[in-house]
Amino acid sequence: MGLFSSTQPPQPTTVPSDEIIPLHFWNTALCMRGTVLDVSLKFDDVLDVSKLRDALNRLLEMEDWRQLGARLRMNVDGKLEYHIPAHFDASRPAFSMTNAQHETSIADHPLGARIPHTTGTPAIFPSPDELSPLLRSADAPKHIDDWTYSDRPQLCIHVITFSDATVITITWLHTLADVMGMTTILNAWTALLQGNREAIPKLQGFRSDPLTQLGQRTPAEKYMHFNRVFGRKEFLWFIGLNIFDRLWYRQEERRTICIPATCLRSLRQQASSEISATSSSEGGTVPFVSESDVLLGWWVRSLYGALGLRTDQTILVNNALNLRTSLHESFMSKDSAYMGNALCMSPTFLQGQQIADEPLGQIALRIRESVAEQRTPEQVEAMTALQMQTMEKTGYLALVGDPRMMLLSCSNWHKARLFDMDFSPAVLQSSAQSSSQNTQKKGKPSYVNGVQHSENSFRNVLSVIGKDAGRNWWLTGVLRTDAWAHVEEQVHKLGSS
C-alpha cells in the first residue's frame, strides 16, 4: 500500500439485475447510520431452527417483503441506497442465519447462566453487553461498513440452542428500521410459523415515503417549541458541555433493571393517590397515568439525585414519539405496515426545583400531558417538518431547549410487545411451566436483551424494554458509572416499601 492508499476494500460490484432504491431521507440521519441494534429473545423452550429459517425464507419471498433482502451501498455522491437482488439463492440469501448448538442446559453455560431472570424482588443486573459473546455470532456486524463493504443482507440472525432453551438474536442497522419496524417483521415471521398468511400486511417499504409527505403539510414554525430550537451556537455550546461531562466522568455503564409487578403496582397506586389529592383540591376529575408514565417519572426522580442535578437547572425529558401510533392518517392503514424509522422526540421541560419538590404522581402526569400536547396532527406535522429541515442542513436531528440543560432520553420498547412474540409452532420441547408461581407461556420470550453498538455515547438514555408474562418490567439504562450507586439505592427502596 502506498502512503496515501486507503485500507478500506472497495464495495462489491453492482449486480446489473439488482433493483436500486435510494434510502428515505428520514433513515439517513447520522444517528441512524451510526447505530447497530441487537435484540435477543430468550425462550425457555427448544425451538426448531429449520422451521424458523423456512418461515423467514417464505416471508422474504413475498411481494414487497423481498425488499428486506436488500444490500446496502454508498453511491458516488455519498448517498445510501438499497440494491435488491432479482432473486435469492445460497450465494445471495435474503437474510443471514447462523446457529450455535450447546448440548448442555443454559444454566450450565458460563454466560447463559448470567442471563437475567426474575427473583421476585427489584434487581439491577450487569451490562447486557457482557452477554454479547454468547448472543451474537463471531462475525456479526457492528458498523455500517460491515454492510456497505460486503454483500451482507440487512437481517443478521443468530440462534443459540441449549438442551432446555433457545435465544434468537436479530442484528440490524438502524437505517433499516426502529424497534417498532422490527416488530412488524417479527409479527409477520410468527404469523407464517402459525400458518396465518392472511395476517401478514402489505409492506410500505422502501418505495413509499409517507414521512416526507408528512413534513410538507404544516410549517415547522407551528411547532410549539420552535422558539427554543438550537441554532449553530447553542448546538456547539451544548455539545461542548457534554464533551466536558464525558471527559470529567469518563466511565459509563449500561445496566439492566427488573421491577416486579407488585412493586410497580404499589408505585402506580402511590402516583394515582398523589394526583387524586391534587385533583380533588382543585375540584377536577382525576387524570390517568400509565405504568410507563410512572416508570419514567420514577427514573427522572432517581437521576435527579444520582446525577447531582441543581434546583435551578433545566431538565429535558426527551420521549421517543412513535409516529405509527400517533393516530396520524399517514400511518392508519390496516392493510399495510410502514417499514423504516418513524420517530420524533417529544420534549418535556422540567425544572430541578419541580423534581425536588413535587411528588412522583405530579412528575409522571407532567410528562404524560406534555407528550399528549405534541401528538396532535398539527404538532406531529410541524415536528416532522422541523426535523427534515434540520437534517438537510446538519445531518442531525433537531434539539430544543437550553444548552446548559440536562438531557434525559427515553425510548419505550414496551409498545413493540416483544415479550408477546409467539414462536410456539417452532417449539420442539418446552421447559416453560404455567403455574401460580410461573406464568411463562410456551413459545414466548421470558427475557429480552437489547444492545446498541455505536461510537456515540448513549449516556442518560433509558430503554423501557417491556413487561414479561409475570407483568414484571424490564429496563436498560446507560449512566456514568458513579451514578449507578444511587439508582441501586432507589431500586432497593422499591422492594422495602
UniProtKB/Swiss-Prot annotation:
Q: In which pathway does it act?
A: Secondary metabolite biosynthesis; terpenoid biosynthesis
Q: Where is this region: Disordered?
A: 430-451
Under the heading Pfam families, the entry gives: Transferase
Question: What InterPro entries does this protein map onto?
Answer: CAT-like_dom_sf, Sec_Metabolite_Acyltrans
Any one Gene Ontology molecular-function term assigned to this protein's record: acyltransferase activity
Q: Can you tell me which residues form the catalytic site?
A: H174 (proton acceptor), D422 (proton acceptor)
Q: Any coiled-coil ranges, and where?
A: none
Xref: Gene3D superfamilies: Chloramphenicol acetyltransferase-like domain (3.30.559.10)
Q: What is its EC number?
A: 2.3.1.-
The processes (GO biological process) annotated in the record are: terpenoid biosynthetic process
Keyword line: Acyltransferase, Transferase
The protein's job, in short, is: Acetyltransferase; part of the gene cluster that mediates the biosynthesis of andrastins, meroterpenoid compounds that exhibit inhibitory activity against ras farnesyltransferase, suggesting that they could be promising leads for antitumor agents. The first step of the pathway is the synthesis of 3,5-dimethylorsellinic acid (DMOA) by the polyketide synthase adrD via condensation of one acetyl-CoA starter unit with 3 malonyl-CoA units and 2 methylations. DMAO is then converted to farnesyl-DMAO by the prenyltransferase adrG.
Q: Which family does it belong to?
A: Belongs to the plant acyltransferase family.
According to the record's subunit comment, the protein's assembly and interactions are:
Monomer.
**Under what name is this protein listed?**
Acetyltransferase adrJ
